[in-house]
Design a protein with these regions (language model features):
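Short catalytic-loop micro-motif centered on adjacent basic/acidic residues
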Residues: 4-7, 117-119
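Beta-strand scaffold of nucleotide-dependent catalytic cores
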Residues: 31-34, 117-120, 142-144
Length: 199
């Protein structure tokens, strides 16, 4: 009879909550592809030199994946599900004089055959934070904390099989997705944790 929680506060962000809602509702069909380029974690050598523990296996236990990206890794599996296979190139000290990874490109495969990539680095300037989820009936794009839906009038699979022209494309409507605007972060997670204990 124990209650356990982890502080994955980005799950309270209104944009990511809306992405989770839209994907898990099934209204947009199954996921076909996932792409997250999250390279806006730029760090200088001075940052890494500021403490002997930084960017070491003993002091931090890892690099960009563990230090900068744990919330992104949580979000990609929360929203898209757990991949069944992961292959990755993790480059240790590629751009900085450090012993842990500062550049990662991961390839993901999901149980339904969907594929994806997760790309991160602490050496891209300017960096990018763009999260795309392509589904059977559209695409979600999250960039600069704005969520856009590219919604197809008909499922891509159905259109592919019934379209008469070889270069036809399914009609698509693009709109910014409204959210509730709430972003409770740590307070929201702590409130939920306390509520679970008390009730």
């Amino acid at each position: 009879n124990r209650v356990f929680a982890m502080m994955f506060n980005q799950r309270t962000n209104c944009v990511y909550r809306k992405m989770h809602e839209l994907v898990t509702s099934g209204d947009l069909g199954a996921i076909k592809r996932v792409n997250w380029i999250i390279t806006d974690w730029y760090r200088t050598q001075s940052y890494y030199d500021s403490g002997d523990w930084r960017a070491t296996w003993e002091g931090e236990g890892g690099g960009v994946l563990l230090n900068q990206c744990p919330h992104n890794l949580d979000l990609i599996q929360w929203i898209c599900g757990m991949p069944s296979k992961v292959q990755a190139f993790c480059h240790e000290g590629k751009w900085h004089d450090i012993e842990v990874e500062d550049d990662v490109t991961a390839y993901l495969e999901y149980p339904n055959g969907a594929t994806g990539v997760f790309i991160t680095s602490t050496a891209d300037a300017p960096g990018t934070n763009r999260f795309e989820i392509t589904l059977e009936k559209g695409k979600l794009v999250c960039e600069n904390n704005v969520l856009t839906l590219h919604e197809l009038e008909v499922s891509e699979r159905e259109f592919c099989k019934t379209a008469k022209g070889g270069f036809d494309k399914p009609p698509c409507h693009v709109k910014e997705v409204e959210t509730d605007g709430l972003n409770e972060q740590h307070v929201g997670v702590l409130r939920a944790f306390a509520g679970r204990i008390l009730h």
